[in-house]
Amino acid sequence: MNIAICPGSFDPITTGHLDIIRRASKLFDHVVVAVGSNLRKQPRLSAAERARLIEKVTADLENVSVEVMEGLLVDFAREQGARVVVKGLRAVSDFESEFEQAQLNRTLYPELETVFIMSASQHSFLSSSAVREIAALGGDVRGLVPDGILETVRQIYSRSDGKI
């Protein structure tokens, strides 16, 4: 079985993330969405809560599962029996850091390949950080996050004080 990992913090999952997951699900036998933590950020929701939101919007994808990932991606990939990491690229600027991470992962787990999927043009500007900022400032995030979690995202990420 050809298993791929789609890792991220998904704080929150965006329509761009979901597009990459859907496209990866057509390329691989099984896709594991690995919900991790970014040590440089303090997420509003726990990894388990973010995973539940992703499960809700990927429920129609039979070959996609969602797991909380703790520790190194390479260790998680080994545990899952995966030899592929799928990453979305929005712009050339994403490539440099993703390339470095892919090289590091390959050093730690030589059998692990990284496959880059170019974001659809309508998602090329989209990031979780932008969604958090728009929601915190009272803006409309419709179309930026999956419809199935729109109200949840509005409630969690909107703040009356405008802080992100």
UniProtKB/Swiss-Prot annotation:
It comes from Rubrobacter xylanophilus (strain DSM 9941 / JCM 11954 / NBRC 16129 / PRD-1). One of its GO terms (molecular function) is pantetheine-phosphate adenylyltransferase activity. Keywords: ATP-binding, Coenzyme A biosynthesis, Cytoplasm, Magnesium, Nucleotide-binding, Nucleotidyltransferase, Transferase. GO terms for biological process: coenzyme A biosynthetic process. This is Phosphopantetheine adenylyltransferase. Reversibly transfers an adenylyl group from ATP to 4'-phosphopantetheine, yielding dephospho-CoA (dPCoA) and pyrophosphate. Transmembrane segments: none annotated. The keyword Ion transport does not apply. The gene is coaD.
